[in-house]
């Protein structure tokens, strides 16, 4: 190819020459940190299964702090948090905890200052505190010093009284920590009348709050706050479903405020449904059908169908086609993955979910990259993907649809006896894509073939994605070598993602090449990882 880069010449300033004389994308410590913040591993593999976090997983983070770049690390933590770039929340909170325990004073100060921004809900704050406790011994440092006490106090004080009341009554405790613990240990001095009421409620209980404030002249805000706390207390004590419904409607109480017994009432569920967020609604469809909240033709079914057909609502809730597809397949099955819950799916809801699946393609933001997807079409793709209710072939078909419908330049190929084009058009349904996949005679899933095929056919691609079960057979050419050859010939700094959807672990990605990523399993968080990797965020 005329004008193509020699393999010994980097395609971009981010590439370096490796030990074999080929060019790879250098993995810097900042790149490793970003991977860790996104999915909890500094290496080139995303695992669906929860990985235990420890200092041994965060060597690049430690090196950056030791090199005097701790404040840059905090900036990365904040931007990952604010822009929602994390597939899992824990690595972000772990990294913040490490920074807050380190020896560098500037990093520590920046970490504590970032606590209210990064720990947006109490669950995050409790997790951060627990990580600090876990790290105390290995990092040989104290914990409840003045800096942490101030950070925790600021977390409460920077919110209004009503905002704190809403979150502390919804997220009461996690990881062995409660609000009462944090208020006691932080020696909080409330910054407002509203906060004084809430902190007294947490530490002393409703009875003392009621006694102290019943005769006092209060602001409108404080009155509203007391009424809300009274409603939260009332709902805990009442067995009367009508009163529960009234309190839900008047004070926007949510499921977390209710007792288990309240949730046995279908009328209570009907009240909760009115303001239920879409993500919670998708999660609870089976339960609400099983307990007869949703019955053929009733107004609740109509409400759900209406919400699922509302494009603005779907976009605002950031519902991805995958979220809907998982809800659809779970609901269609008529039973949960675990437990004894069973239901008969409502046909109108099934239709609404099916329609919402196609509607949500419009809400996916394109990356503007050229994709080449390579799909394993073997019978073993009918196994369930790790971390999902979907089988591997359904995940692959849906991903082909997502890319075809959102990216202007994309191609799909299938592993037959050789690589063959597998046209997926924007008007195809999921079933049509699956049927077409079944008609392709299956061949070996040699992960180097997509790059070899693209090089032979002069197909330009920024990102190659292989979808397979756990068959990641490497032929005569290693995928890393095929990718480097493709970069050299086409003069494109292309990337490769291999999704082994039923695999517990495999290694194809060159750990020293930032343009390669392995994925073991496939869950909804995997979508964020793919997007971040494609857009060069990680």
Curated annotation (Swiss-Prot):
Disulfide bonds: none annotated. Keywords: Acetylation, Cilium biogenesis/degradation, Cytoplasm, Metal-binding, Phosphoprotein, Repeat, Ribonucleoprotein, RNA-binding. Residues 120-284 are annotated as: RNA-binding. Highest in brain, followed by lung, muscle, kidney and heart. Lower levels are found in testis, liver and spleen. The keyword Ion transport does not apply. Residues 361-538 are annotated as: VWFA-like domain. GO terms for molecular function: metal ion binding; misfolded RNA binding; RNA binding; U2 snRNA binding. A divalent metal cation binds at residues 378, 380, 445. The modification N6-acetyllysine is found at residue 224. The modification Phosphoserine is found at residues 4, 19. The modification N-acetylmethionine is found at residue 1. It is found in: Cytoplasm. GO terms for biological process: cellular response to interferon-alpha; cilium assembly; immune system development; regulation of gene expression; response to UV; smoothened signaling pathway. Pfam families: TROVE, vWA_Ro60. Residues 16-369 form the TROVE domain. Disruption phenotype: Cilia absent or reduced, virtually no cilia of the normal 5 uM mean length. GO terms for cellular component: cilium; cytoplasm; cytosol; nuclear body; nucleus; ribonucleoprotein complex. The horseshoe-shaped TROVE domain is built with 7 helical HEAT-like repeats, and is closed by the VWFA-like domain giving rise to a ring-shaped monomer. Single-stranded RNA is bound in the positively charged central cavity. The MIDAS-like motif in the VWFA-like domain binds divalent metal cations. Belongs to the Ro 60 kDa family. RNA-binding protein that binds to misfolded non-coding RNAs, pre-5S rRNA, and several small cytoplasmic RNA molecules known as Y RNAs. May play roles in cilia formation and/or maintenance. Identified in a IGF2BP1-dependent mRNP granule complex containing untranslated mRNAs. Found in a complex with PUF60 and Y5 RNA. Interacts with RAB11FIP5. This is RNA-binding protein Ro60. It comes from Mus musculus. The gene is RO60.
């Amino acid at each position: 190819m005329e004008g193509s880069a020699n393999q010994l010449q980097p395609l971009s300033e981010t590439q370096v020459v490796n030990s074999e004389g080929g060019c790879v994308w250098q993995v810097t410590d900042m790149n490793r940190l970003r991977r860790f913040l996104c999915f909890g591993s500094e290496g080139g593999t995303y695992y669906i299964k929860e990985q235990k976090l420890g200092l041994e997983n965060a060597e690049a983070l430690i090196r950056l702090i030791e090199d005097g770049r701790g404040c840059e690390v905090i900036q990365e933590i904040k931007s990952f948090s604010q822009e929602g770039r994390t597939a899992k929340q824990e690595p972000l909170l772990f990294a913040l905890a490490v920074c807050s325990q380190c020896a560098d004073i500037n990093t520590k100060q920046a970490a504590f200052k970032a606590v209210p921004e990064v720990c947006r809900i109490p669950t995050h704050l409790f997790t951060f505190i627990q990580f600090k406790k876990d790290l105390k011994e290995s990092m040989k440092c104290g914990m409840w010093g003045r800096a942490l006490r101030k950070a925790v106090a600021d977390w409460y004080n920077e919110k209004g009284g009503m905002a704190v009341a809403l979150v502390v009554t919804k997220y009461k405790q996690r990881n062995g920590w409660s609000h009462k613990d944090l208020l006691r240990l932080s020696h909080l001095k409330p910054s407002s009348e509203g906060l004084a009421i809430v902190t007294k409620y947490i530490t002393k209980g409703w009875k003392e709050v009621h006694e102290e404030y019943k005769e006092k002249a209060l602001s409108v805000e404080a009155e509203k706050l007391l009424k809300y706390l009274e409603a939260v207390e009332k709902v805990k004590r009442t067995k009367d479903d009508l009163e529960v419904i009234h309190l839900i409607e008047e004070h926007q109480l949510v499921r977390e405020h209710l007792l288990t017994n309240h949730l046995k009432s279908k009328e209570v569920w009907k009240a909760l449904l009115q303001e239920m967020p879409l993500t919670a609604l998708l999660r609870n469809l089976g339960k609400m059908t099983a307990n007869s909240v949703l019955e053929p033709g009733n107004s609740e079914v109509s409400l759900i169908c209406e919400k699922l057909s509302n494009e603005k609502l779907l976009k605002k809730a950031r519902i991805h086609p995958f979220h809907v597809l998982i809800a659809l397949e779970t609901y269609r099955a008529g039973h949960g993955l675990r437990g004894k819950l069973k239901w008969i799916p409502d046909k109108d809801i099934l239709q609404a979910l099916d329609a919402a699946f196609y509607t949500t393609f419009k809400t996916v933001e394109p990356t503007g990259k050229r994709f080449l997807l390579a799909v394993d079409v073997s019978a073993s793709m009918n196994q369930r993907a790790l971390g999902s209710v979907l089988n591997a072939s359904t995940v692959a078909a849906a991903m082909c649809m997502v890319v075809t419908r959102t990216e202007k330049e994309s191609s799909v190929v299938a592993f037959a006896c050789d690589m063959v084009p597998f046209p997926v058009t924007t008007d195809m349904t999921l079933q049509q894509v699956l049927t077409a996949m079944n008609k392709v005679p299956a061949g070996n899933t040699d992960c180097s073939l997509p790059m070899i095929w693209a090089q032979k056919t002069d197909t330009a691609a920024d990102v190659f994605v292989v979808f397979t079960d756990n068959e990641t057979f490497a032929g005569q050419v290693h995928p890393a070598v095929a990718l480097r050859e493709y970069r050299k010939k086409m003069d494109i700094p292309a990337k490769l993602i291999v999704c082994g959807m039923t695999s517990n672990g495999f290694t194809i990605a060159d750990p020293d090449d930032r343009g390669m990523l392995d994925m073991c399993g496939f869950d909804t968080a995997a979508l964020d990882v793919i997007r971040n990797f494609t857009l060069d965020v990680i």
